[in-house]
């Protein structure tokens, strides 16, 4: 047999053995997790911003499952709070966040002050900042969650958090206040026409 064929057979045998070992280990050492934690974690926005006081969304999901408040996630907003309340079977808190945090904000980079250090890009958990080394950076407003993690690392203080401009697309339309009236139609039935 040629040396290439022997090498291929040896590598295939090693791959098979290691695959079996990993498969056995994954079954043997499987960690059972609480399904409610997984459901809560799926609802959270996964920005890992830390505004809730926990190092990420998974630890916050575990805290909610253990009875912590459901309204500590500013990037998730009111929609996330309502989904969490529905899942946990609790009432939606009347004031989700304090007044200052309830106004959605996004990062804004003053490009005339930006030196292109990329520290804000590295800090952004959702990759909402674009730019390169020694080039100007800008924020993709639709992607920014307002987590405020990019402000502190900036050496020139060229990043500020500004309120989101209200447009017809992001306006909170309250459709429940529109009166709905059922109009009865008094059309004669076919049997009365005969």
Curated annotation (Swiss-Prot):
Keywords attached to this entry: 4Fe-4S, Cell inner membrane, Cell membrane, Electron transport, Iron, Iron-sulfur, Membrane, Metal-binding, Repeat, Translocase, Transport
PROSITE patterns: 4FE4S, 4FE4S_FER_1, 4FE4S_FER_2
Any one GO molecular function term: 4 iron, 4 sulfur cluster binding
InterPro entries found in the cross-reference section: 4Fe-4S_dom, 4Fe4S_Fe-S-bd, 4Fe4S_Fe_S_CS, Elect_transpt_cplx_RnfB/RsxB, RnfB/RsxB_Proteobac, RnfB_subfamily
Gene3D superfamilies for the chain: 3.30.70.20, Electron transport complex subunit B, putative Fe-S cluster
Highest taxon listed in the record's lineage: Bacteria
GO biological process, one term: electron transport chain
Cofactor(s) it depends on: [4Fe-4S] cluster
Enzyme class: translocase
Stretches assigned to the 4Fe-4S ferredoxin-type domain: 105-134, 135-164
Chain residues that bind [4Fe-4S] cluster 1: 49, 52, 57, 73
Residues binding [4Fe-4S] cluster 2: 114, 117, 120, 154
Subunit structure: The complex is composed of six subunits: RnfA, RnfB, RnfC, RnfD, RnfE and RnfG.
Function: Part of a membrane-bound complex that couples electron transfer with translocation of ions across the membrane.
Protein family membership: Belongs to the 4Fe4S bacterial-type ferredoxin family. RnfB subfamily.
NCBIfam families membership: PRK05113.1 (NF003475), rnfB (TIGR01944)
Protein name: Ion-translocating oxidoreductase complex subunit B
Organism: Aliivibrio fischeri (strain ATCC 700601 / ES114) (Vibrio fischeri)
